Amino acid sequence: MSQNASVGIVMPQKIPFEMPLVLENGKTLPRFDLMIETYGELNAEKNNAVLICHALSGNHHVAGRHSAEDKYTGWWDNMVGPGKPIDTERFFVVGLNNLGGCDGSSGPLSINPETGREYGADFPVVTVKDWVKSQAALADYLGIEQWAAIVGGSLGGMQALQWTISYPERVRHALVIASAPKLSTQNIAFNDVARQAILTDPDFNEGHYRSHNTVPARGLRIARMMGHITYLAEDGLGKKFGRDLRSNGYQYGFGVEFEVESYLRYQGDKFVGRFDANTYLLMTKALDYFDPAADFGDSLTRALQNVKAKFFVASFSTDWRFAPERSHELVKALIAAQKSVQYIEVKSAHGHDAFLMEDEAYMRAVAAYMNNVYKECQQ
């Protein structure tokens, strides 16, 4: 497996949809755009397409670089590319930025066609079901009747799961990684605290901060810092930073003293420079609302009854945000519904963020599963 290979320089595409999209909350987007990137080639049978669904802070830029000078590759470059687990020499891979995002798809930074101004806080709350509906429109646009696989980690895994329920005939395989069939009470609480940090920032201006030439940087920074802590494992964080100080002794003040504090401030500042606060609010609400069993008498097994897809489910031993027990819930429901499922729990010291990292056992498991997906494409 060539982990050094790359898809190279890639160019995003903005796909316009001049059609209304009725959302789960009853509101309608009169039109919408989806920003996408594609890697590899769609075969003549159009049966080798793979959709990558992103997590809270992800986007369409899954792999490669936008220019030779680009310092960073896409957020899942170690997973997607030539000879990698999701092999672009075999598959036509599609990444997109979801509705409500801040990287080119319709969202708070977009122009509201009804007012001629940015949506800002007026962009409607969207759900995982809404995203899947818009992704189905994208599949139609690309001429893809059925995805060979839909792959996602965390919030992305929720989208993969919802696809199998909303459009059972259009998905052959779903890879649900470091995810859950619904958020725990604790996770909903974490999301609310993060939102409160943003909503109570004096620069938030009821979500119309850009028209006031302000940014709720303090609130968004705190939200990201808190979130980042939950994505890491205690032991991994301890091994990386311990109680190391930036100077030789305590300063007996409230500035940055510990190395871990410096790291979190850096992560918060970096996030503020690339992400929109209204988008953060929308993404966390989509997480909170996801609960496919709710439409089936709170029975996940019943929700999965009409699913046609085969499943690959992966969790990570030290992930406490989306603990292995949450994946077990999905696996047990799939078995009860008599569906095909393969499961792996990966031993890792990296917590929830492990799904983004290069772990040999994890990568080999995904590669082996995707190899079987490819064999199906050849039949």
Swiss-Prot record:
Catalytic reaction list: L-homoserine + succinyl-CoA = O-succinyl-L-homoserine + CoA
Pfam families linked: Abhydrolase_1 (PF00561)
Compartments where found: Cytoplasm
Transit peptide is among the record's keywords: no
Signal sequence annotation: none
GO BP annotation list: methionine biosynthetic process
Name of protein: Homoserine O-succinyltransferase
